[in-house]
Amino acid sequence: MAIDPHKDVDGFHPTNFGKMALDMESFIPATPYGIMELLRRYQIDISGKHAVVIGRSHIVGRPMSILLSRKSSPGNATVTLTHSRTKNLTALTKEADIVVSALGVPNFLKEDMVKEGAIIIDVGITRVPDASHPKGYIITGDVDYEHVKEKASFITPVPGGVGPMTIAMLLQNTYLAYSRHADI
């Protein structure tokens, strides 16, 4: 790895990933960190809830599963980490109290895939061609937002949901790196 773990504000260095997994002080990847901050600030209790994370990337899926299951607040969820080879994904998401989708497939998560009152976190962000839009495209998430929002107790929009929180937590990590270096 080229970057020093003490300067790894993205939280991707294996040292930081390992420390995060062991619940030690480390830089946490910005997107999962932002999602946890959303849950904390909106006072969403996830303790004892079943969370399904769709996507097993090192950037979102795996760190998200670790943070959701941590013995902390928010945390203490029972987590199922799914991926492209998961069988019966719909059966899992229909039983989930929390669904975090980090797949990158526009409008993948449909209304019939979630239960009433579920907490839906949409991490996906895809440019979808749209000739009627001035830019020629629209930004779409993994969740069929307009239909799923009717069933969800909490849902993040795309754009404007997880993305701004990712930026905020990246800045938080940057400040933390500076304060450690400056001994503030």
Protein language model regions, located:
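Glycine-rich phosphate/diphosphate-binding loop of Rossmann-like nucleotide-binding domains
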Residues: 18, 24-119, 128, 136-138, ...
